[in-house]
Structure formats: C-alpha cells, structure tokens
Amino acid sequence: MLFRKLGLASALTLGLAGGALAQTMGIATNPQGSLYYAVGSAISQVVSNKTKHSLRVQPMGGSSTYVPTINQGQVEFGLLNVIDPAFAWEGVENFKGQPPAKNLRLVAVIFQLPIGIAVLDNAPYKTLADLKGVRMPAEFTAQSTIRFVQDTVLANAGLSTDDMQKVPVRDYVQGMRLLGEKRVDAALMGVGAAQAQEVNAKLQSEGGIRFLNLVDTPEAAKRMHQIMPAYPYLQQPSSAIPGVKAGGATLMTYSAFIVSSSHIADDVVYDVAKTVHGNAKELAASHGSLRRFNPDRMSEVHKVEWHPGAIKFYKEIGQWPPKAPK
C-alpha cells in the first residue's frame, strides 16, 4: 500500500478508526542475496520496530527496474549508489529511454562502498599508473554503473579503461573471477567482498591479491570528481579483507543512499531519517556493511534534490546544508 501525500489524511483516519493501523510501505532493492537486499532488510526491520510505520523490503531486478516505481510513488523508498540517482534524474546511461526521474528525492547516505583495483601479489605493478596497457575487464554490459566506478579509480592516476587492453565482461563479479583465472592482469574489487575472498584463496600460489594504492592529493581527487563523487580513504589491514597489506591501502569510497520521491509525505521521510540516525548500533549489528554507516554524515552534496522531510531533520541535527567529506 502506498503512503502518498494525497492519501495521508485517509490513512490517518483509518489509523484512528482501526486502532492505529500500520501503513505498510516498501523499500526497493536488488534481488534477494544481494548487498542491497540485506541492507534493505536491516533498515525495514529497524523502521518497523521503532516507528508507527511498517516497512517491507521489496527485491526487484535492479535499479533501472525499481527507480521508475519510486519516481511514480508506487514504492516509497529504495537503495541506490551515488551515480544512479544522477543518471535517473537525467534519463541517461542505464536509465536511457526512461523519462527523467524528476520526482526522485534523496533521504540519507546509508553507508560507504569501498572499492579498489587489485592485482596478483607477485605481479610487477606497484602503482595504478603502472597498469597502463594491461588486460582489464571492460564494458560491464549488465552493470553499466561499474564502468564509471572503474574509470574513477583509474582517473586517480590519470588513466581510464581506454588505456587498457579491454576484456569484455557482464559485470564486475565476472571481472574478479577473470583475475582469479589469470585472464586479466588487474580487476576492480569490492573491499572484503565474498568474491574477492574467493579469488584471493584461488591465487594463494601467487601470494593472493594485492590492492594498488590511490594517490590522496587535491589534483587526483579533482580528476576523480570529474566522473563521480568519490574519495580516497585509508583501509587498515584486516583478516577479513584480503589484498590489504601491512600499513594499509589507500582505496576509494563512494556513497549508497536511501531514496524516496516527492510523492511521499514529509513526516514519513522525517521519521525514517530520524530512526536510521538514532539506531546506528542496531544497523551495524545486523549487517557488516552497515558498520560503515556514519550517523554524523547522512547528507551529501548531490545534483538530485533532497526530500523536504529529510532536510527538516538534518537542519535539526546540524547536518544541513551538506558538506563534502574531508
């Protein structure tokens, strides 16, 4: 059932007449088994347990499938990375052929997605700049967003996928597997991802995988930001994160968002933002990726508009207007 602005009065009337009936809302995610599905499940549980609202995860085929339903108010919330809202807003790239999603609104930065480019540990490549001309996954026909993510990492060193020997793949998971099979020389990898752990185990005779460091300078950051808003960060070594050697590795991070639409009532979005902010520990306990949720940085500069209900809450806690990460 929908919780649109037009239906708010009738929903409240039903609540009063029926003993505060909960209005069931949806949060759209990628398919069951995906990272976004797990995160969406955690968010829906916290919101349902801590507010008068009932929120249920709704897995779909992918962002290009569920963004139109959010834009039209058919689903109240969803999870998107930092690039998808901008593409959907303009109707380009993986949203080409769809009307611009001008009703889309941002609600919260929910966690950071850490990623980097890895090579075999015994490979001769020591820096990203050393990768020019090597074999790398390309095209990402089923996951076009990843093309921009990979080029953003490479832009840190003044490179792009066009500087490489391109090996066409469907998605970045296939690219990681090709590194494990030594059919590419370097591949984009999610930090601590299950597939990265599998590839690392497969390459133990070569010492496993090794992430290449990004350069943390204003000039390098400027090159990255010409493609997408992403930032270098220092990842400390951990037994759960293969490829990060002693002393840590400077990798890339970018944001994942809770999104909604202009159809959804301000007080509903306010409640969701406030509840997520106040339950960081519960969220972190529910899924490892939500340990990267920072309640002190829930807003971020973006070309897509923020929902008024979210803005109201961020003004109350001193997070509006949003600031770029340091």
Summary of predicted features, one role per range:
Residues 67, 76, 163-228, 311:
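Ligand-binding pocket segment of bilobal, Venus flytrap-like solute-binding proteins
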Residues 276-293:
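Periplasmic-binding protein-like
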Residues 16-22:
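Sec/Tat signal peptide C-region and signal peptidase I cleavage site
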Residues 97-110, 239-249:
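A structural signal for short loop-to-beta-strand junctions that line the ligand-binding cleft
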Residues 24-50, 54-56, 113-181, 300, ...:
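Bilobed "Venus flytrap"/periplasmic-binding protein-like clamshell domains
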Residues 1-10:
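Bacterial N-terminal signal peptides that target proteins for export
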Residues 209-271, 313, 321, 325:
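C-terminal lobe and pocket-closing loops
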Residues 39-45, 58-98, 117, 173-178, ...:
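Pocket-flanking alpha-helical
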